Amino acid sequence: LLMDKINSLEINKTGLCYMNFNVRTYRAERQKVWDQFSSKNWVTPTSNLTMENFYFDMASHKFVISPRGNGVDCHRTWEALYLRTIPIVRASTHMNGFTDLPILFVNDWSELNYNRLQQFYETVQNKFFNLDKMKISYWKQRILNAKNTCLINR
């Protein structure tokens, strides 16, 4: 897997915040986010990269801006976690089960600034996070446990 290859490299987190997404997907939010952050000197905005360059760039940053896509979340959030980069997402009820993962939740994109990123990174950089929730085996076991509980409580 390409992400495994990139994860096997010792990539320094030289950039603070990475931004790479298609503004034509869920334009109502993404265009505003792009316009708001593309000129910030602490954000690296890019587009139209090969998958390998995209993953490498993401892995070399501490954070990645991950606005929702066609659905209520975005593949970038999960790719970022896998690449040990902290995704920044809008807080929503569908993400309540993931507050124990290294994700920076914002209620509004206007909350995002250089100081907030630095402070958040300081609080999480040396913490251990159990990323089992990213594995299908975790969810299969949760479903089996729930099924067994239902059968026992009949």
Language-model segment annotations:
Residues 1-78, 82-105, 116-154:
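Nucleotide-sugar donor-binding catalytic core of glycosyltransferases
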Residues 107-109:
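Active-site donor-binding loop signature of nucleotide-sugar glycosyltransferases
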Residues 113:
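GIY-YIG nuclease catalytic motif and its immediate N-terminal context
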